Amino acid sequence: DTIEGKLPQKKIVREAARGYSSYGNQIGLATGYVKEVYHPDYVAKRMEIGAVMGAAPRRAVQRLTSDPGDKIILLGGRTGRDGIGGATGSSKAHNTQSTSVCGAEVQKGNAPTERKLQRLFRREEVSHIIKKCNDFGAGGVSVAIGELADGLRVQLDKVPKKYAGLDGTELAISESQERMAVVVSPSDVKTFLGYAAEE
């Protein structure tokens, strides 16, 4: 049954599956795992869980520490206002009017860029020069880069933007699923950028 002020369960299930499948198809990955969770605590809408798993040979993965003088490179999609507040938005109480307000908090997907990142990170010659990396999920630059080193200097004016007019706070907190921050040694910057340009 549909609770007053909430979207119908049938619409949620169909649209969630359609969106998940569409994005997976665009990046060339099989979306093989989707699960619906039925529980009294999910009475307004059932929980939909989807996952795509990645694997790499152990020799291609390293976990190193960042050292003074190392460089952090941002790559992938550009920053915009569409990714501001996504993490907090997912925790809000929603109703039928939420889509007109909360849609702006969710970063607009860019599947071709995501696919390029996947191809780049699959190359062992690339992964071997990455000391650490992080994605731009919840929290954007402020979290993704903040977790990479104990102390650092971030130049927000160098963050690639979708358009002009973004202030420092917007640049710092905008989220994206198609951006990564990588730590490389200064001597590897040119090599890494060359590999990235090939994608």
Q: Residue ranges of each PLM-predicted region?
A:
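Glycine/proline-enriched, intrinsically flexible loops and inter-domain linkers
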Residues: 1-199
